[in-house]
From Swiss-Prot:
The name this protein goes by in its record: 1-deoxy-D-xylulose-5-phosphate synthase
UniProt-annotated binding residues for thiamine diphosphate: H72, G111, H112, S113, G143, A144, N171, Y278, E360
Function per UniProt: Catalyzes the acyloin condensation reaction between C atoms 2 and 3 of pyruvate and glyceraldehyde 3-phosphate to yield 1-deoxy-D-xylulose-5-phosphate (DXP).
Class of this enzyme: transferase
């Protein structure tokens, strides 16, 4: 078959069912080929190939809003939308995004979960006000239905009666093992012993019944399917079709045409296999969700093994040690047990650590209640996903001044996932909150010390750490953690000082070493705490060093520069501050090293800028 992928509705309509199936197979090959080289979201995209093809065949992608929840199922859509020639650049610097992106022709940006139905509702309202006949189509996975926002939208959609199609991709998996009553609800009818035996009896009946009775028996079987799975949606006022085989193009196309003709809000419940078409990925929960480059034949990663432990692994081990030492430690993650390292604790202490699915707001508030009851919660969460629970952080933790620990993974630039996932805002949105303490480790030993301190600390506290490994290892001796105390790592008479925070200390040290090779020098401070700052040390520093460079992986606005300038103004100190934090723009995708170079935040670029201040 030609490697050209049909990408218009008209072209797809001309293909036979067999040709469409061949198209699906060739697309799977392409997705596997590209993801094996570039990394990406593999299993979820492989499971949604037929769904995307059917969407493009029944609806008009040029006018009907296609909304992909999270975008983990959008690769086939990209190929059908004419992106075949640049698909090899997926997730690469200046290449095709791994998520939906309006600048690439998609309807809406997506990277965080459970927004699709709300977007569909809003699109419905706009279309109605314009007097147009377009129909929004939202593709959402069963994992995304664990978030409350999806039900807020379904609640309004069912009451609105707008024409809208919600295509539910139920693969009985989210990123990790599915959690909660909703997941169980979606699968219970198909899993019951009664239904399975009933289905077998119907199959035997169909073999012996005359044609006239066969039709009625089939209709009876289909009606039985509706009793349990569809009840939730129908009670909300939505039409319901399914469950149907999400890999049977004929069934999907028929269901979409039926839903389109209804001119009402309709949920089509499809059941798919995550990782379909790549045997090594089928049936796996987390391993093949988001992957790096790998060998297609063996499934083994082709990335050179890093002998250094990741910051996540260090966090996980330290928390295990603390949990065995202090029985009042509890913890939670929102659908990212393996990503945050909390899976090890859930396995060892299932009554003290929980995965609550994609429910960041619930995660934070439930842990606030546990803190109120005398427990010490550790909330393990990606920096970018903490944004989803900001009100709960303020209302339920900060105002109450509760002893809650926020462990913010993936702080700083995270690479190929791009602007929806960069962890560069947490300092800016947490620093203004009264009662909050903020700090960051520079290396493994300091991570251990900070976590021990966080357990003992009174009040809400948050520490951030990077994706991957710490750059620094044992270049500097660790210090005891004391509230609001920094560590002076390199002390001399230079009028220039480097102030580092977290992973920024490593970048500052790399620049300083290059300067020392040129017979230049600078003071190096590990702030450790962003809030409160070590005012005593900084006042001493201001007497000798009049140029301060800030090294921190946060945006400038509300970051370390802002906090330092507030301090200088408070004491009427006159110091020139130069910040190497990120500018006021969203940071796009690409390998972290390439993104840093583009932003002129790599060591060579920073060194060039610093050298201008040496005479």
């Amino acid at each position: 078959m030609s490697k050209k992928f049909a990408h218009t509705q008209e072209e797809l309509e001309k293909l036979s069912l067999k040709e469409l199936e061949n198209l699906a197979a060739s697309m799977r090959e392409k997705i596997i080929q590209v993801v094996s080289k570039n990394g990406g979201h593999l299993s979820s995209n492989l499971g949604a190939v037929e769904l995307s093809i059917a969407m493009h065949l029944v609806f008009d992608a040029k006018k009907d809003p296609f909304i992909f929840d999270v975008s983990h199922q959008s690769y086939t859509h990209k190929l059908l939308s004419g992106k075949e020639e640049i698909f090899d650049t997926l997730r690469q610097i200046n290449g095709l995004s791994g998520y939906t992106k309006p600048s690439e022709g998609d309807y809406f940006v997506a990277g965080h979960s459970s927004t699709s139905i709300s977007l569909a509702v809003g699109a419905c309202k706009a279309i109605a006000l314009k007097g147009e006949k377009r129909i929004p189509v939202a593709l959402i996975g069963d994992g995304a239905l664990s978030a409350g926002m999806a039900y807020e939208a379904l609640n309004e959609l069912g009451d609105s009666k707008f024409p809208c199609v919600i295509l539910l991709n139920d693969n009985e998996m989210s990123i990790s093992k599915p959690i909660g009553a909703i997941s169980k609800y979606l699968s219970q009818a198909m899993a019951t012993q009664f239904y399975q035996s009933f289905k077998k009896r119907i199959a035997k009946m169909l073999d012996i019944l005359p044609d006239s009775a066969t039709y009625m028996a089939k209709r009876f079987e289909e009606s039985f399917k509706l009793i349990t799975p569809g009840l939730l949606f129908e009670e909300l006022g939505l039409e319901y079709i399914g469950p149907i085989d999400g890999h049977n193009l004929g069934e999907i196309i028929s269901a979409l045409k039926q839903a389109k003709a209804m001119q009402k809000p309709c949920v089509i419940h499809t059941q798919t296999i995550k990782g379909k078409g790549y045997a090594l990925a089928e049936g796996k929960h987390a391993k093949w969700h988001g992957v790096g480059a790998f060998d297609i034949d063996s499934g083994e990663s082709v990335k050179k093994s890093d002998t250094k432990k990741s910051a996540t692994e260090i966090f996980s081990k330290n928390l295990l040690d603390l949990a065995s030492k202090y029985e009042n430690i509890v913890g939670v993650t929102a659908a990212m047990p393996s990503g945050t390292g909390l899976d090890k604790l859930i396995e060892k202490y299932p009554n003290r650590f929980w995965d609550v699915a994609i429910a960041e707001q619930h995660a934070v508030t439930s842990m606030a209640a546990m803190a109120k009851e005398g427990f010490k919660p550790f909330i393990a969460i990606y920096s970018t996903f903490l944004q989803r629970a900001y009100d709960q952080v303020i209302h339920d933790c900060a105002i109450m001044n509760l002893n809650v620990v926020f462990a913010m993974d993936r702080a700083g630039i995270v690479g190929e996932d791009g602007e929806t996932h960069q962890g560069v805002f947490d300092l800016s949105f947490l620093a203004p909150l009264p009662n909050f303490t903020l700090l960051a480790p520079r290396d493994e030993q300091m991570m251990q010390n900070i976590m021990e301190y966080a357990y003992l600390h009174q009040g809400p506290i948050a520490f951030r750490y990077p994706r991957g490994s710490f750059i620094l290892d044992k270049e500097f001796n660790p210090c005891e953690i004391k509230l609001g105390k920094a560590q002076w790592l390199v002390k001399n008479s230079s009028e220039i000082a480097f102030l580092g925070y977290g992973q920024g200390v490593a970048k500052a040290w790399q620049v300083l070493r290059a300067l020392q090779e040129m017979n230049n020098n600078a003071n190096l401070i590990d702030l450790i705490f962003a809030k409160p700052l070590d005012e005593e040390l900084l006042c001493e520093l201001a007497k000798k060093s009049k140029i301060w460079f800030i090294f921190s992986e946060n945006v400038k606005i509300g970051g370390i520069e802002s906090l330092i300038n507030n301090f200088l103004q408070k004491y009427d100190l006159h110091v020139k501050v130069v910040s190497f934090e990120y500018e006021d723009k969203f940071i796009e995708h690409g390998k972290t090293s390439e993104v840093e170079k583009n932003l002129e935040k790599d060591v060579n670029s920073l060194l060039t800028k610093v050298l201008k201040f040496y005479h």
